[in-house]
Protein backbone atom coordinates (compact mmCIF):
# COMPACT_ATOMS: atom_id res chain seq x y z
CA UNK A 1 0.00 0.00 0.00
CA UNK A 2 2.81 2.36 0.96
CA UNK A 3 4.53 1.54 -2.32
CA UNK A 4 1.39 2.48 -4.24
CA UNK A 5 1.08 5.80 -2.41
CA UNK A 6 4.73 6.65 -3.06
CA UNK A 7 4.35 5.88 -6.76
CA UNK A 8 1.19 7.98 -7.01
CA UNK A 9 2.88 10.87 -5.20
CA UNK A 10 5.86 10.76 -7.57
CA UNK A 11 3.59 10.73 -10.61
CA UNK A 12 1.70 13.73 -9.22
CA UNK A 13 4.94 15.68 -8.71
CA UNK A 14 6.11 14.77 -12.22
CA UNK A 15 2.85 15.91 -13.83
CA UNK A 16 2.87 19.21 -11.91
CA UNK A 17 6.49 19.85 -12.91
CA UNK A 18 5.71 19.11 -16.54
CA UNK A 19 2.68 21.41 -16.46
CA UNK A 20 4.69 24.26 -14.94
CA UNK A 21 7.54 23.76 -17.43
CA UNK A 22 5.26 23.75 -20.45
CA UNK A 23 3.22 26.66 -19.11
CA UNK A 24 6.28 28.82 -18.50
CA UNK A 25 7.69 28.17 -21.98
CA UNK A 26 4.49 28.47 -23.98
CA UNK A 27 4.53 31.42 -26.36
CA UNK A 28 1.93 32.76 -28.74
CA UNK A 29 2.53 32.16 -32.42
CA UNK A 30 0.69 35.31 -33.58
CA UNK A 31 -0.45 33.59 -36.77
CA UNK A 32 -3.80 35.34 -36.74
CA UNK A 33 -3.01 38.54 -34.88
CA UNK A 34 -0.46 41.33 -34.94
CA UNK A 35 2.54 40.95 -32.65
CA UNK A 36 2.70 44.76 -32.50
CA UNK A 37 -0.93 45.71 -31.77
CA UNK A 38 -2.89 42.51 -31.22
CA UNK A 39 -5.22 43.40 -34.10
CA UNK A 40 -6.58 40.57 -36.23
CA UNK A 41 -4.72 39.88 -39.45
CA UNK A 42 -6.42 39.67 -42.84
CA UNK A 43 -9.77 40.77 -41.43
CA UNK A 44 -12.58 41.47 -43.91
CA UNK A 45 -13.30 44.70 -42.07
CA UNK A 46 -9.79 45.98 -42.76
CA UNK A 47 -6.66 46.38 -40.68
CA UNK A 48 -3.24 44.78 -41.25
CA UNK A 49 -2.91 42.30 -44.11
CA UNK A 50 -0.29 39.56 -44.37
CA UNK A 51 0.52 36.83 -46.86
CA UNK A 52 0.37 33.94 -44.39
CA UNK A 53 0.81 31.38 -47.19
CA UNK A 54 4.29 32.58 -48.17
CA UNK A 55 6.93 29.94 -47.49
CA UNK A 56 10.20 30.41 -49.36
CA UNK A 57 11.45 32.20 -52.44
CA UNK A 58 10.87 30.11 -55.53
CA UNK A 59 13.75 29.39 -57.88
CA UNK A 60 13.45 31.46 -61.04
CA UNK A 61 13.69 30.02 -64.56
CA UNK A 62 17.18 28.78 -65.41
CA UNK A 63 18.59 29.35 -61.92
CA UNK A 64 20.33 27.13 -59.35
CA UNK A 65 20.44 27.87 -55.62
CA UNK A 66 23.88 28.66 -54.17
CA UNK A 67 24.04 28.69 -50.39
CA UNK A 68 26.30 31.51 -49.22
CA UNK A 69 29.12 31.44 -46.71
CA UNK A 70 32.68 32.48 -46.04
CA UNK A 71 35.60 31.67 -48.32
CA UNK A 72 39.07 32.82 -49.28
CA UNK A 73 38.67 35.05 -52.30
CA UNK A 74 41.68 35.53 -54.54
CA UNK A 75 44.66 33.46 -55.57
CA UNK A 76 45.68 30.61 -53.28
CA UNK A 77 48.66 29.57 -55.42
CA UNK A 78 51.71 31.12 -57.07
CA UNK A 79 51.49 34.24 -59.25
CA UNK A 80 53.79 33.54 -62.23
CA UNK A 81 52.31 36.46 -64.18
CA UNK A 82 53.13 38.87 -61.32
CA UNK A 83 49.83 40.70 -61.74
CA UNK A 84 49.42 41.10 -57.97
CA UNK A 85 45.76 41.92 -58.48
CA UNK A 86 44.06 39.17 -56.50
CA UNK A 87 45.77 38.70 -53.18
CA UNK A 88 43.85 36.27 -50.96
CA UNK A 89 41.33 37.82 -48.57
CA UNK A 90 38.47 36.44 -46.53
CA UNK A 91 34.99 37.33 -47.77
CA UNK A 92 31.41 36.33 -47.02
CA UNK A 93 28.62 36.22 -49.58
CA UNK A 94 24.93 35.81 -48.91
CA UNK A 95 22.96 33.00 -50.47
CA UNK A 96 21.89 33.70 -54.04
CA UNK A 97 20.83 32.06 -57.29
CA UNK A 98 22.88 31.74 -60.45
CA UNK A 99 22.16 30.60 -63.98
CA UNK A 100 22.85 26.91 -64.45
CA UNK A 101 24.52 27.69 -67.78
CA UNK A 102 25.76 30.69 -69.71
CA UNK A 103 23.15 32.71 -71.59
CA UNK A 104 22.78 31.05 -74.98
CA UNK A 105 22.32 32.44 -78.47
CA UNK A 106 18.70 31.28 -78.45
CA UNK A 107 18.00 33.01 -75.14
CA UNK A 108 19.45 36.25 -76.47
CA UNK A 109 17.54 35.93 -79.75
CA UNK A 110 14.30 35.82 -77.75
CA UNK A 111 15.30 39.18 -76.30
CA UNK A 112 16.00 40.60 -79.76
CA UNK A 113 12.72 39.26 -81.11
CA UNK A 114 10.77 40.88 -78.26
CA UNK A 115 12.46 44.25 -78.83
CA UNK A 116 11.81 44.07 -82.55
CA UNK A 117 8.11 43.34 -82.00
CA UNK A 118 7.44 45.83 -79.21
CA UNK A 119 9.77 48.59 -80.44
CA UNK A 120 9.78 48.08 -84.23
CA UNK A 121 12.93 49.57 -85.77
CA UNK A 122 10.80 50.88 -88.64
CA UNK A 123 9.55 53.49 -86.17
CA UNK A 124 12.11 56.30 -86.06
CA UNK A 125 11.59 56.72 -82.30
CA UNK A 126 12.60 53.12 -81.67
CA UNK A 127 15.18 52.43 -84.38
CA UNK A 128 18.21 52.77 -82.13
CA UNK A 129 16.72 50.55 -79.40
CA UNK A 130 16.97 47.45 -81.57
CA UNK A 131 20.32 48.45 -83.04
CA UNK A 132 21.75 49.02 -79.57
CA UNK A 133 20.79 45.52 -78.44
CA UNK A 134 22.39 43.67 -81.37
CA UNK A 135 25.57 41.73 -80.49
CA UNK A 136 28.74 42.58 -82.37
CA UNK A 137 29.10 39.66 -84.77
CA UNK A 138 32.30 41.14 -86.21
CA UNK A 139 34.22 40.05 -83.10
CA UNK A 140 34.96 36.76 -84.87
CA UNK A 141 37.06 38.43 -87.55
CA UNK A 142 40.82 38.08 -87.48
CA UNK A 143 43.24 39.85 -89.83
CA UNK A 144 45.03 36.58 -90.57
CA UNK A 145 42.19 34.12 -90.11
CA UNK A 146 39.11 33.00 -92.03
CA UNK A 147 36.22 33.14 -89.55
CA UNK A 148 33.41 34.48 -91.74
CA UNK A 149 31.36 31.36 -91.10
CA UNK A 150 31.06 32.37 -87.42
CA UNK A 151 30.58 36.03 -88.29
CA UNK A 152 27.59 35.17 -90.47
CA UNK A 153 26.13 32.18 -88.64
CA UNK A 154 27.13 31.91 -84.98
CA UNK A 155 24.40 34.12 -83.50
CA UNK A 156 21.35 33.05 -85.53
CA UNK A 157 21.99 29.62 -87.06
CA UNK A 158 20.09 26.83 -85.23
CA UNK A 159 23.29 24.76 -85.14
CA UNK A 160 24.60 27.23 -82.55
CA UNK A 161 21.30 27.84 -80.71
CA UNK A 162 22.48 26.22 -77.47
CA UNK A 163 25.97 27.72 -77.59
CA UNK A 164 26.88 30.63 -75.30
CA UNK A 165 26.25 34.06 -76.80
CA UNK A 166 29.34 36.22 -77.42
CA UNK A 167 29.86 39.66 -78.91
CA UNK A 168 27.79 41.10 -76.07
CA UNK A 169 29.15 44.06 -74.12
CA UNK A 170 28.76 44.44 -70.36
CA UNK A 171 26.13 47.12 -70.92
CA UNK A 172 24.11 44.84 -73.20
CA UNK A 173 24.34 42.02 -70.65
CA UNK A 174 22.88 44.32 -67.99
CA UNK A 175 20.03 45.33 -70.31
CA UNK A 176 19.27 41.68 -71.07
CA UNK A 177 19.09 40.98 -67.32
CA UNK A 178 16.61 43.83 -66.82
CA UNK A 179 14.46 42.56 -69.69
CA UNK A 180 14.52 39.03 -68.26
CA UNK A 181 13.32 40.28 -64.87
CA UNK A 182 10.29 41.95 -66.40
CA UNK A 183 9.34 39.00 -68.58
CA UNK A 184 9.51 36.52 -65.69
CA UNK A 185 7.41 38.72 -63.39
CA UNK A 186 4.98 39.46 -66.21
CA UNK A 187 4.31 35.74 -66.57
CA UNK A 188 3.89 35.31 -62.79
CA UNK A 189 1.15 37.95 -62.69
CA UNK A 190 -0.63 36.31 -65.60
CA UNK A 191 -0.49 32.86 -63.98
CA UNK A 192 -1.82 34.33 -60.71
CA UNK A 193 -4.81 35.75 -62.55
CA UNK A 194 -3.84 39.38 -62.01
CA UNK A 195 -3.16 40.54 -65.55
CA UNK A 196 -5.14 39.53 -68.60
CA UNK A 197 -4.44 36.19 -70.18
CA UNK A 198 -1.76 36.47 -72.89
CA UNK A 199 -1.35 40.17 -72.09
CA UNK A 200 2.31 39.81 -72.97
CA UNK A 201 1.49 39.05 -76.61
CA UNK A 202 0.42 41.44 -79.33
CA UNK A 203 1.37 44.62 -77.50
CA UNK A 204 1.16 47.92 -79.29
CA UNK A 205 4.25 50.05 -79.77
CA UNK A 206 5.65 50.90 -76.36
CA UNK A 207 2.89 49.22 -74.29
CA UNK A 208 5.25 47.28 -72.07
CA UNK A 209 5.35 45.75 -68.62
CA UNK A 210 8.00 46.97 -66.19
CA UNK A 211 8.33 45.44 -62.72
CA UNK A 212 9.39 48.75 -61.19
CA UNK A 213 6.53 50.62 -62.85
CA UNK A 214 4.00 48.01 -61.73
CA UNK A 215 5.14 48.26 -58.11
CA UNK A 216 5.31 52.07 -58.02
CA UNK A 217 2.63 53.18 -60.49
CA UNK A 218 0.56 50.14 -61.51
CA UNK A 219 -2.01 52.19 -63.41
CA UNK A 220 0.75 53.23 -65.84
CA UNK A 221 1.68 49.63 -66.71
CA UNK A 222 0.99 48.53 -70.29
CA UNK A 223 0.69 52.18 -71.25
CA UNK A 224 -2.17 52.67 -68.78
CA UNK A 225 -4.31 49.93 -70.34
CA UNK A 226 -6.45 48.71 -67.39
CA UNK A 227 -7.95 45.90 -69.45
CA UNK A 228 -4.50 44.30 -69.47
CA UNK A 229 -3.26 45.30 -66.01
CA UNK A 230 -6.47 44.21 -64.22
CA UNK A 231 -7.84 41.78 -66.79
CA UNK A 232 -7.16 38.53 -64.92
CA UNK A 233 -9.84 36.44 -63.22
CA UNK A 234 -8.43 37.13 -59.76
CA UNK A 235 -8.37 40.87 -60.36
CA UNK A 236 -11.96 40.83 -61.62
CA UNK A 237 -13.07 38.88 -58.53
CA UNK A 238 -11.40 41.38 -56.18
CA UNK A 239 -12.86 44.32 -58.07
CA UNK A 240 -16.39 42.89 -57.79
CA UNK A 241 -16.09 42.61 -54.01
CA UNK A 242 -14.83 46.16 -53.57
CA UNK A 243 -14.04 48.69 -56.26
CA UNK A 244 -12.15 50.76 -53.71
CA UNK A 245 -10.00 47.84 -52.60
CA UNK A 246 -6.31 48.56 -52.14
CA UNK A 247 -5.53 44.99 -53.18
CA UNK A 248 -6.33 45.36 -56.87
CA UNK A 249 -2.62 45.20 -57.64
CA UNK A 250 0.09 42.88 -56.38
CA UNK A 251 2.51 44.62 -54.04
CA UNK A 252 5.97 43.73 -52.84
CA UNK A 253 4.56 42.58 -49.49
CA UNK A 254 2.64 39.81 -51.28
CA UNK A 255 5.91 38.04 -52.10
CA UNK A 256 4.86 36.94 -55.59
CA UNK A 257 7.28 38.90 -57.75
CA UNK A 258 10.86 37.77 -58.20
CA UNK A 259 13.87 39.89 -57.25
CA UNK A 260 15.80 41.24 -60.22
CA UNK A 261 17.94 39.16 -62.54
CA UNK A 262 21.37 40.78 -62.68
CA UNK A 263 25.03 40.08 -63.31
CA UNK A 264 26.72 38.31 -60.38
CA UNK A 265 29.27 40.23 -58.36
CA UNK A 266 32.86 39.11 -58.66
CA UNK A 267 32.75 37.63 -55.15
CA UNK A 268 29.56 35.70 -55.93
CA UNK A 269 30.91 34.38 -59.22
CA UNK A 270 34.19 33.21 -57.71
CA UNK A 271 32.45 31.62 -54.72
CA UNK A 272 29.99 29.78 -56.95
CA UNK A 273 32.68 28.69 -59.43
CA UNK A 274 35.10 27.15 -56.95
CA UNK A 275 32.34 25.12 -55.25
CA UNK A 276 34.04 24.44 -51.93
CA UNK A 277 31.13 22.31 -50.69
CA UNK A 278 32.97 19.25 -51.99
CA UNK A 279 35.87 19.82 -49.57
CA UNK A 280 33.74 20.75 -46.57
CA UNK A 281 34.06 18.61 -43.46
CA UNK A 282 31.40 19.74 -40.99
CA UNK A 283 32.24 23.42 -40.39
CA UNK A 284 35.71 23.42 -41.97
CA UNK A 285 37.18 23.17 -45.44
CA UNK A 286 39.59 20.24 -45.77
CA UNK A 287 41.80 22.13 -48.19
CA UNK A 288 41.89 24.33 -51.26
CA UNK A 289 40.68 23.85 -54.82
CA UNK A 290 42.46 24.96 -57.96
CA UNK A 291 39.56 24.37 -60.35
CA UNK A 292 35.77 24.02 -60.07
CA UNK A 293 36.34 20.26 -59.98
CA UNK A 294 38.41 18.29 -57.46
CA UNK A 295 42.03 17.63 -58.28
CA UNK A 296 45.05 19.49 -59.58
CA UNK A 297 44.70 18.57 -63.26
CA UNK A 298 42.43 19.46 -66.16
CA UNK A 299 41.95 15.86 -67.31
CA UNK A 300 39.46 13.35 -65.93
CA UNK A 301 40.77 10.54 -63.76
CA UNK A 302 37.58 8.47 -63.91
CA UNK A 303 37.77 5.14 -65.70
CA UNK A 304 35.09 5.84 -68.33
CA UNK A 305 36.37 9.30 -69.22
CA UNK A 306 40.02 8.99 -68.25
CA UNK A 307 42.18 11.48 -70.11
CA UNK A 308 39.31 13.66 -71.36
CA UNK A 309 39.53 17.35 -70.66
CA UNK A 310 37.08 18.64 -68.04
CA UNK A 311 36.63 22.02 -69.73
CA UNK A 312 36.82 23.69 -73.13
CA UNK A 313 40.07 25.65 -73.41
CA UNK A 314 43.12 26.08 -75.64
CA UNK A 315 45.40 23.04 -75.27
CA UNK A 316 48.53 24.66 -76.65
CA UNK A 317 49.91 26.62 -79.57
CA UNK A 318 47.74 25.81 -82.56
CA UNK A 319 45.77 23.23 -80.57
CA UNK A 320 42.18 24.14 -79.67
CA UNK A 321 40.73 20.64 -79.35
CA UNK A 322 43.11 17.81 -80.17
CA UNK A 323 43.37 15.69 -83.29
CA UNK A 324 40.64 14.41 -85.60
CA UNK A 325 38.91 11.33 -84.23
CA UNK A 326 40.29 11.91 -80.73
CA UNK A 327 39.34 15.40 -79.60
CA UNK A 328 40.37 16.05 -76.02
CA UNK A 329 37.56 18.48 -75.23
CA UNK A 330 35.14 17.98 -78.12
CA UNK A 331 35.27 21.56 -79.38
CA UNK A 332 37.48 23.99 -81.26
CA UNK A 333 35.56 27.22 -80.61
CA UNK A 334 32.79 27.40 -78.02
CA UNK A 335 30.91 24.23 -77.13
CA UNK A 336 27.23 23.55 -76.56
CA UNK A 337 26.14 24.21 -72.98
CA UNK A 338 26.22 21.22 -70.60
CA UNK A 339 28.92 19.50 -72.65
CA UNK A 340 30.95 18.99 -69.48
CA UNK A 341 30.12 17.95 -65.94
CA UNK A 342 28.79 20.62 -63.55
CA UNK A 343 30.60 21.69 -60.41
CA UNK A 344 29.39 20.87 -56.92
CA UNK A 345 26.76 23.62 -56.99
CA UNK A 346 25.32 22.20 -60.22
CA UNK A 347 26.73 25.00 -62.39
CA UNK A 348 28.09 24.24 -65.86
CA UNK A 349 31.16 25.72 -67.58
CA UNK A 350 32.36 27.87 -64.71
CA UNK A 351 35.80 27.32 -66.22
CA UNK A 352 36.29 27.23 -69.97
CA UNK A 353 33.96 27.65 -72.95
CA UNK A 354 33.56 31.43 -72.53
CA UNK A 355 34.82 33.86 -69.93
CA UNK A 356 32.00 35.76 -68.21
CA UNK A 357 31.17 39.34 -67.34
CA UNK A 358 30.61 40.14 -63.68
CA UNK A 359 29.12 43.29 -62.21
CA UNK A 360 32.23 44.86 -60.67
CA UNK A 361 34.28 47.81 -61.84
CA UNK A 362 37.91 46.69 -62.00
CA UNK A 363 40.54 47.80 -59.53
CA UNK A 364 43.82 45.98 -58.83
CA UNK A 365 43.01 45.70 -55.13
CA UNK A 366 39.96 44.18 -53.45
CA UNK A 367 39.46 46.56 -50.53
CA UNK A 368 38.66 43.96 -47.88
CA UNK A 369 39.89 46.36 -45.21
CA UNK A 370 36.76 48.44 -45.80
CA UNK A 371 34.26 45.69 -46.50
CA UNK A 372 34.28 41.89 -46.31
CA UNK A 373 30.53 41.18 -46.73
CA UNK A 374 28.92 40.95 -50.18
CA UNK A 375 31.90 42.83 -51.63
CA UNK A 376 31.09 44.81 -54.77
CA UNK A 377 32.69 47.82 -56.44
CA UNK A 378 30.38 49.66 -58.81
CA UNK A 379 27.54 51.16 -56.79
CA UNK A 380 25.77 54.06 -58.51
CA UNK A 381 22.73 54.92 -56.41
CA UNK A 382 19.68 56.29 -58.21
CA UNK A 383 16.07 57.08 -57.38
CA UNK A 384 12.79 57.43 -59.22
CA UNK A 385 12.32 60.79 -60.93
CA UNK A 386 9.27 62.65 -59.61
CA UNK A 387 7.25 65.17 -61.64
CA UNK A 388 5.62 68.38 -60.42
CA UNK A 389 2.49 66.43 -59.42
CA UNK A 390 4.42 64.14 -57.12
CA UNK A 391 4.13 61.16 -59.45
CA UNK A 392 6.93 59.08 -60.93
CA UNK A 393 8.05 60.00 -64.42
CA UNK A 394 7.42 57.27 -66.96
CA UNK A 395 9.63 57.15 -70.05
CA UNK A 396 7.67 57.63 -73.27
CA UNK A 397 8.63 57.30 -76.93
CA UNK A 398 9.33 61.04 -77.02
CA UNK A 399 11.45 61.11 -73.85
CA UNK A 400 13.85 58.22 -74.45
CA UNK A 401 17.39 59.19 -73.45
CA UNK A 402 20.15 57.74 -75.64
CA UNK A 403 23.80 57.37 -74.69
CA UNK A 404 26.59 57.40 -77.26
CA UNK A 405 29.28 54.95 -76.15
CA UNK A 406 33.00 55.35 -76.74
CA UNK A 407 32.69 52.93 -79.65
CA UNK A 408 30.11 55.18 -81.33
CA UNK A 409 27.28 52.75 -80.64
CA UNK A 410 24.04 54.37 -79.44
CA UNK A 411 21.95 52.67 -76.76
CA UNK A 412 18.75 53.60 -74.94
CA UNK A 413 19.27 54.42 -71.27
CA UNK A 414 15.64 53.57 -70.46
CA UNK A 415 12.87 51.93 -72.45
CA UNK A 416 9.34 53.32 -72.81
CA UNK A 417 7.19 52.18 -69.90
CA UNK A 418 10.06 52.24 -67.39
CA UNK A 419 10.50 54.78 -64.60
CA UNK A 420 13.09 57.47 -65.30
CA UNK A 421 16.04 57.18 -62.91
CA UNK A 422 18.07 60.12 -61.57
CA UNK A 423 21.08 60.19 -59.21
CA UNK A 424 20.42 60.49 -55.50
CA UNK A 425 21.16 63.96 -54.12
CA UNK A 426 21.62 65.68 -50.77
CA UNK A 427 18.05 64.80 -49.81
CA UNK A 428 19.26 61.21 -49.45
CA UNK A 429 22.92 61.79 -48.50
CA UNK A 430 22.78 64.62 -45.94
CA UNK A 431 24.31 63.48 -42.61
CA UNK A 432 24.34 59.91 -43.85
CA UNK A 433 27.30 57.80 -42.75
CA UNK A 434 27.12 54.96 -45.32
CA UNK A 435 27.55 57.04 -48.49
CA UNK A 436 27.76 60.69 -49.48
CA UNK A 437 27.39 60.62 -53.26
CA UNK A 438 25.55 58.79 -56.00
CA UNK A 439 28.57 57.45 -57.89
CA UNK A 440 30.81 55.27 -55.71
CA UNK A 441 32.67 53.35 -58.39
CA UNK A 442 36.07 54.85 -57.56
CA UNK A 443 35.61 55.14 -53.79
CA UNK A 444 39.00 54.87 -52.01
CA UNK A 445 40.66 53.84 -55.27
CA UNK A 446 40.58 56.46 -58.00
CA UNK A 447 38.58 59.29 -56.45
CA UNK A 448 40.11 62.64 -55.55
CA UNK A 449 40.86 61.68 -51.97
CA UNK A 450 42.83 58.60 -53.02
CA UNK A 451 45.25 60.32 -55.39
CA UNK A 452 48.63 61.53 -54.20
CA UNK A 453 47.85 64.97 -55.62
CA UNK A 454 44.94 65.47 -53.21
CA UNK A 455 45.42 68.26 -50.63
CA UNK A 456 42.19 69.38 -48.98
CA UNK A 457 43.32 72.04 -46.45
CA UNK A 458 39.88 71.82 -44.86
CA UNK A 459 37.79 71.98 -48.04
CA UNK A 460 35.16 69.42 -48.89
CA UNK A 461 36.26 66.78 -51.40
CA UNK A 462 33.91 68.06 -54.11
CA UNK A 463 35.39 71.55 -53.70
CA UNK A 464 38.98 70.45 -54.34
CA UNK A 465 40.15 71.03 -57.92
CA UNK A 466 42.73 68.62 -59.34
CA UNK A 467 44.38 68.80 -62.75
CA UNK A 468 42.63 66.20 -64.98
CA UNK A 469 46.05 65.08 -66.18
CA UNK A 470 46.96 64.11 -62.60
CA UNK A 471 44.32 61.47 -62.08
CA UNK A 472 45.18 58.39 -60.06
CA UNK A 473 44.61 56.22 -63.14
CA UNK A 474 45.88 58.10 -66.18
CA UNK A 475 43.74 56.25 -68.73
CA UNK A 476 42.92 57.41 -72.28
CA UNK A 477 40.06 59.87 -72.57
CA UNK A 478 38.39 59.22 -75.91
CA UNK A 479 35.63 61.65 -76.79
CA UNK A 480 32.56 60.80 -78.80
CA UNK A 481 29.37 62.64 -79.59
CA UNK A 482 26.63 63.01 -82.15
CA UNK A 483 26.64 65.56 -84.95
CA UNK A 484 23.68 67.82 -85.63
CA UNK A 485 21.53 67.14 -88.65
CA UNK A 486 22.90 70.35 -90.17
CA UNK A 487 26.35 68.75 -90.04
CA UNK A 488 25.16 65.58 -91.69
CA UNK A 489 24.34 63.66 -88.51
CA UNK A 490 26.33 60.61 -87.48
CA UNK A 491 28.96 60.25 -84.79
CA UNK A 492 31.84 62.60 -84.03
CA UNK A 493 34.83 60.61 -82.72
CA UNK A 494 37.97 62.08 -81.18
CA UNK A 495 40.63 59.50 -80.36
CA UNK A 496 42.97 60.27 -77.45
CA UNK A 497 46.41 60.33 -79.10
CA UNK A 498 48.32 61.31 -75.98
CA UNK A 499 51.55 59.37 -75.43
CA UNK A 500 51.50 60.02 -71.67
CA UNK A 501 48.74 57.55 -70.80
CA UNK A 502 49.96 54.92 -68.35
CA UNK A 503 46.88 52.84 -67.57
CA UNK A 504 43.69 51.44 -69.08
CA UNK A 505 41.88 51.48 -65.73
CA UNK A 506 38.91 53.80 -65.29
CA UNK A 507 35.31 53.62 -64.08
CA UNK A 508 34.14 52.10 -67.37
CA UNK A 509 36.18 48.89 -67.30
CA UNK A 510 34.56 45.79 -65.84
CA UNK A 511 35.89 42.53 -64.47
CA UNK A 512 35.43 39.30 -66.37
CA UNK A 513 36.18 35.90 -64.87
CA UNK A 514 37.01 32.39 -65.95
CA UNK A 515 38.88 30.92 -68.87
CA UNK A 516 37.51 30.50 -72.37
CA UNK A 517 37.97 28.41 -75.50
CA UNK A 518 40.68 30.89 -76.46
CA UNK A 519 42.65 30.77 -73.18
CA UNK A 520 45.27 28.44 -71.75
CA UNK A 521 44.51 26.50 -68.57
CA UNK A 522 46.12 29.18 -66.37
CA UNK A 523 42.90 31.19 -66.68
CA UNK A 524 40.65 28.29 -65.64
CA UNK A 525 41.39 29.10 -62.01
CA UNK A 526 38.27 30.98 -60.77
CA UNK A 527 40.48 33.35 -58.78
CA UNK A 528 42.05 34.87 -61.90
CA UNK A 529 40.66 38.25 -62.87
CA UNK A 530 40.88 40.39 -65.99
CA UNK A 531 39.12 43.50 -67.22
CA UNK A 532 37.71 44.95 -70.42
CA UNK A 533 35.83 48.14 -71.41
CA UNK A 534 32.15 47.81 -70.53
CA UNK A 535 30.96 49.04 -73.94
CA UNK A 536 33.08 46.64 -76.01
CA UNK A 537 32.74 42.94 -76.79
CA UNK A 538 34.88 39.95 -77.81
CA UNK A 539 34.44 36.47 -79.25
CA UNK A 540 35.37 34.83 -75.94
CA UNK A 541 33.36 36.74 -73.28
CA UNK A 542 29.77 35.75 -72.52
CA UNK A 543 27.73 36.04 -69.34
CA UNK A 544 25.22 34.42 -67.03
CA UNK A 545 22.70 35.99 -64.67
CA UNK A 546 22.29 35.83 -60.91
CA UNK A 547 19.49 36.68 -58.49
CA UNK A 548 19.63 37.63 -54.81
CA UNK A 549 17.89 35.37 -52.31
CA UNK A 550 15.46 36.93 -49.85
CA UNK A 551 14.68 35.28 -46.54
CA UNK A 552 16.50 32.37 -44.95
CA UNK A 553 20.10 31.48 -45.73
CA UNK A 554 19.39 27.89 -46.74
CA UNK A 555 16.71 25.81 -48.40
CA UNK A 556 17.54 22.81 -46.21
CA UNK A 557 15.49 21.95 -43.08
CA UNK A 558 16.92 23.16 -39.81
CA UNK A 559 19.22 20.78 -37.99
CA UNK A 560 21.19 20.78 -34.77
CA UNK A 561 24.60 22.45 -34.91
CA UNK A 562 27.47 21.53 -32.66
Label every model-predicted segment:
Residues 2-11:
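Bacterial N-terminal signal peptides that target proteins for export
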Residues 51-53, 83-86, 499, 529-534:
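Short, P/G- and charge-enriched loop/turn segments at secondary-structure junctions
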Amino acid sequence: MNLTKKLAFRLLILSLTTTLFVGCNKTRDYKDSSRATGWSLNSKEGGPQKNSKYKEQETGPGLVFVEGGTFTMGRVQDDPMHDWNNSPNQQHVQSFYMDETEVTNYMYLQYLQWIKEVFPPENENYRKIYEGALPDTLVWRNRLGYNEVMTNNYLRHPAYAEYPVVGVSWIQAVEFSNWRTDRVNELILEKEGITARNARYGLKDGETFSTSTYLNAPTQTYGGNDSLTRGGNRSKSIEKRSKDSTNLYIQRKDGLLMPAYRLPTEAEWEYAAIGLVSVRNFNNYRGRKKYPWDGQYTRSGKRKTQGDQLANFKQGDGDYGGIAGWSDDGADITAEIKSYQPNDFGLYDMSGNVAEWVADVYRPIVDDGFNDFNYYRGNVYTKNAIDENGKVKIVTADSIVYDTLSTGKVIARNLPGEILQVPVDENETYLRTQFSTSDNRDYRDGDKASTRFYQSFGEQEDEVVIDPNKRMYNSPNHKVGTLDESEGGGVDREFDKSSSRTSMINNEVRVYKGGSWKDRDYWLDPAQRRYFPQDMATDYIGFRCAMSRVGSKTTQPKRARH
